[in-house]
Regions:
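Conserved catalytic core of the tyrosine transesterase superfamily
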Residues: 1-310
Length: 310
């Protein structure tokens, strides 16, 4: 028996003798088990919303139909959620149902019949130019803070999100043990989506700044700890205001978020001719096509530019 089959068989046995509601709760726990902490937090919220919807019509996951999924999607629309958010909810529910099917908890997978909507990504609207990013960082450096350490922290958060192209969940989860020296610089080990690990070599100037910021912090200490406790990471909800404040200082839109810096990392590298596989590796994209889209969002030329004036 292969390891995968053994795991599925074990999980099926764990669910078999439980009452319907207990089995449903255990199913969700097993589904969440191997996911990163940030994903577990969001997926728990999505699963709770879905099972509450089913409970409202007297059903459990084992009785789910395609019609239930359509109705749940409509409920999300009625809550005035944006389409990308609804897509995220439905993707999580499909993942849960797929897991339920693989473990034998359900006999057929209604989620397989549901297609997620294709969204207009408009990545070009979420890319800052290099001057804007430099301005965000420089003006933050010149801003008066009550505590100097908080200013240094905010500047390094801006730099890591942009220079290393990190996701916000990856940034807040960093511990000092993830930083490894290499010659005059060093690398940081990042655990991304799907618990996939990647290594990012940092430029020398950023490595030096990170080590100066570290001080006497221990290996297991969070790089950006919560002010409510040293053994807790900075909450991701507390990072967005740092980015928005920096954008406001630079006279940019209030819509600027952490992910804009990641988008900008990919776009600026593509425009500078950085090899696409290297960008993919640094950003942790599972599919090269995800990285390739950044090459085309701000073209330097097009066939339209080569036609005569009409």
């Amino acid at each position: 028996m292969s390891p995968v089959v053994a795991v599925v068989s074990k999980r099926r046995k764990q669910l078999k003798h439980l009452a319907p509601i207990d089995a449903q709760q255990r199913l969700v726990q097993l589904w969440l088990h191997d996911k990163p902490a940030s994903t577990r937090e969001r997926y728990t919220r999505f699963a709770t919303a879905f099972t509450a919807h089913l409970g409202g019509v007297g059903k459990t996951i084992s009785q789910t139909t395609v019609e239930d999924l359509v109705e749940f999607s409509e409920v999300l629309y009625q809550r005035n959620l944006k389409e990308p958010t609804i897509n995220t909810y439905m993707a999580a529910v499909r993942s849960l149902l797929s897991f339920a099917y693989k473990t034998g908890y359900i006999q057929f997978n209604p989620g397989a019949a549901i297609k997620l909507k294709k969204l207009d990504q408009r990545l070009h609207e979420k890319v800052l130019n290099e001057t804007d990013i430099a301005l965000m960082i420089r003006l933050t450096e010149r801003t008066e803070y009550r505590y100097k350490a908080l200013k240094v922290r905010d500047v390094l958060i801006l730099k890591l999100l942009y220079v290393a192209g990190m996701r916000i969940s990856e940034l807040v989860g960093l511990r000092w043990k993830d930083f490894t020296p290499r010659d005059r610089t060093g690398q940081v080990t990042v655990v991304g989506k799907g618990n996939k690990t990647r290594h990012i070599l940092l430029p020398e100037y950023l490595w030096v700044e990170m080590m100066e910021y570290r001080g006497d912090a221990g290996e297991c200490d969070y790089v950006f700890p919560s002010r409510n406790g040293k053994n807790k990471p900075l909450n991701r909800q507390n990072v967005d205001p740092i980015i928005k404040d920096a954008a406001e200082r630079a006279g940019l839109s209030e819509k600027v978020s952490c992910h804009w810096l990641r988008h900008s990392h990919a776009t600026h590298n593509a425009e500078r001719g950085t090899p696409v596989p290297l960008i993919q590796q640094t950003m942790g994209h599972a599919d090269l096509a995800t990285t390739t889209q950044y090459i085309h969002i701000r073209p330097g030329d097009s066939s339209a530019m080569h036609l005569p004036r009409v």
